[in-house]
């Protein structure tokens, strides 16, 4: 089976061709970072319009790069949610329309399931069951995964997600958009142990996250300290260490609660070097193993949507003719495969 994958949930247009036997044959990605930079964040209307401009040329490019004709395709997979409704509808309209005109089955894919399954695109794939830490700009959650579609959310963010906290803190520090990667780069030159920031919600039982208070703590620290490059770097490092420690503590609890020895980390924040190192150290202590996608598949992309969608097409979970987007869509409501 060979499918076309379409991702348009936020500010990246991702297209991919995935074959069940040959693997990933082609993927193209267009990022709108420059478009939104002047606004300090994603402007939904601008994002939707840019998806409209880019999606068809990118589909043509992916088909060409994969040496794939329309008649070679067995289905179309597009992100149905969660995400920005306008952006979602661009991908849904194009994906469902192409499927109808080409007489192909279609499936709407859960964006976070795409992230969760992104490590399956690598040479070394995690076996079920495992615990997944999904960390992105819009989501932070720990999920017990017993199979595709067999998900139990163990904990999630009750306010700011980890990626959102990175971006907002970067903005407080005067860093340009996108702030998260810039803050991590600044933190690399920071000195350890200059500041001690709280590890939110680690002093009580449970697996939920909360990063809004940490962001406020950082804001107060910035206001009270000198405004020089080294001080900013030290604050950035202390913030990053606080987030990484918090995520690591929660992951340990989730692994102990489930008894699992495999940890998957995915989503945009999973590209963070300090987080990867911290979780690798944790899993070594626990006698387990951590899995994550390569850098290009940590951010939103069409490859993960193509892979996740193919699994559901094989299970016969097809989309009807209606074009739908779901800006909110609980992960644990998905059907098992």
UniProtKB/Swiss-Prot annotation:
Residues at which substrate binds: 134-138, 167, 180, 272
GO biological process, one term: tRNA threonylcarbamoyladenosine modification
GO terms for cellular component: cytoplasm
Keyword Transmembrane: no
GO molecular function: iron ion binding; N(6)-L-threonylcarbamoyladenine synthase activity
Keywords linked to the UniProt accession: Acyltransferase, Cytoplasm, Iron, Metal-binding, Transferase, tRNA processing
Details of cofactor binding: Binds 1 Fe(2+) ion per subunit.
Annotated residues for binding of Fe cation: 111, 115, 300
Location(s), subcellular: Cytoplasm
Protein name: tRNA N6-adenosine threonylcarbamoyltransferase
């Amino acid at each position: 089976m060979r499918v076309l994958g379409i991702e348009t949930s936020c500010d990246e247009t991702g297209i991919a061709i995935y074959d069940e036997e040959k693997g990933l044959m082609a993927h193209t990605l267009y990022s709108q970072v420059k478009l939104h930079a002047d606004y300090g964040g994603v402007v939904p209307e601008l994002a939707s319009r840019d998806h409209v401009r880019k999606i068809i040329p990118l589909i043509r490019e992916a088909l060409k790069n994969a040496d794939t004709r329309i008649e070679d395709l067995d289905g179309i997979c597009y992100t149905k949610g969660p995400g920005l409704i306008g952006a979602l509808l661009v991908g849904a309209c194009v994906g469902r329309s192409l499927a109808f005109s080409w007489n192909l089955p279609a499936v709407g894919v859960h964006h976070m399931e795409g992230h969760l399954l992104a490590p399956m695109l690598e040479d070394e794939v995690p076996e079920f069951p495992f615990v997944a830490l999904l960390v992105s700009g819009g989501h932070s959650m720990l999920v017990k995964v017993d199979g595709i579609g067999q998900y139990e959310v163990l904990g999630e963010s009750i306010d700011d997600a980890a990626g959102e906290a990175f971006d907002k803190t970067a903005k407080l520090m005067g860093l340009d958009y996108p702030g998260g990667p810039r803050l991590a780069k600044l933190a690399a030159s920071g000195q350890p142990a200059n500041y001690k920031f709280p590890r939110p919600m680690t002093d009580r039982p449970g697996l939920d996250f909360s990063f809004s208070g940490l962001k406020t703590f950082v804001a107060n620290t910035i206001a009270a300290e000198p405004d020089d490059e080294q001080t900013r770097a030290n604050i950035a490092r202390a913030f990053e260490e606080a987030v990484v420690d918090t995520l690591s503590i929660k992951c340990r609890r989730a692994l102990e609660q489930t008894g699992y020895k495999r940890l998957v980390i995915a989503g945009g924040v999973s590209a963070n070097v300090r987080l990867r190192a911290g979780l690798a150290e944790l899993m070594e202590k626990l006698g387990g193993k951590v899995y994550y996608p390569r850098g290009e598949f940590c951010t939103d992309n069409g490859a993960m949507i193509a892979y996740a969608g193919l699994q559901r097409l094989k299970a016969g979970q097809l989309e009807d003719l209606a074009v739908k987007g779901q800006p909110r869509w609980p992960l644990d409501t998905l059907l098992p495969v």
